[in-house]
Amino acid sequence: MNLRPPLLALSLATVLMLSACAGGGTGVTKSSRFGTREHVDHQVATQLSLAKANFSVGEIDGRDGTLTNRATERYVASHPGSPAVRPDAKPYTTYTIRPGDFKYVGPLEPTNEGQAKMKYLTYESMLELVAERYHASQALVAYLNGLPLNPTLVAGQTLVVPNVEPFRIEALNVKGSGRAGNGNFVRISSERGTLEVLNQNGGLVAYYPVSCGSARNATPKGDWKIINQVPLPTFRWDDEMLNKGVRSQDFFMFPPGPNNPVGVFWTGLNKAGVGIHGNPLPDTLFQGRSHGCIRMTNWDVITLPQYVGVGSKVVIE
């Protein structure tokens, strides 16, 4: 993702984007099928336990996979002498769909021009809303409730979901957003696709999976710093910038929303066009490469301001 240098207009929660992001390929694999119900429950409980300890696995999906293995390895390495990850004792809770939830669900226009004319980029289905709210894959929510992948869900319907702190798009409150840094810093590995928050002594505070750039549009290595944090950003699509690296007047400005190409939160760096941001499709986050930015799930990216702020150092390796 290429982004213009920060403007004063950022106070209006507007970020001018100059190219689009693709997925992030970092050798990530996962099982294509669910195992037994017992195995799914064990995996969900393990993934949940890691997430609650600030070792994100991305989507909670109940399957074996690289992201869970990496988070487990990092957890064990950072807790020498401690027991291995203990699966969460209460991995599930329930959610009852409310009439007001449907305000955030609707069809998206199929073209850039059409989406640019929309006021808000909603979820495309209630299953998508519920899954993102509980940090889960849509396939897992469907599996847990005996549903097809394109179910018709209605207000009043109760679903079994992972027992996490819910990501509520209707009450998005990014705690600490825009405050000054507190001494913590960020370390990103482009090769492994990981982002770690460390304290002044180098102690690990939080761990996340991320996707980074390709050989053609590499995420820039070096020492940078955070210069802004923008909840619910807009997105500027410019084909000339994407293909030729030249800003043009032929562009589309996408409105905010969970399906905005940069998700629900932008953390800008003092490297023109580069930032850490959310993503509308968490299930495809690690299947390709970005155009230089660092992408996270929407529910992960909004937690960053709890640990780092404006002025915090970001080391990209």
Where are these regions (language model features)?
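Gly/Pro-biased beta-strand-loop elements
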Residues: 171-279
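Bacterial signal peptide processing site
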Residues: 22-25
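C-terminal soluble interaction/assembly domains
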Residues: 252-317
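Primarily a LysM-type cell-wall glycan-binding module
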Residues: 34-69, 97-135
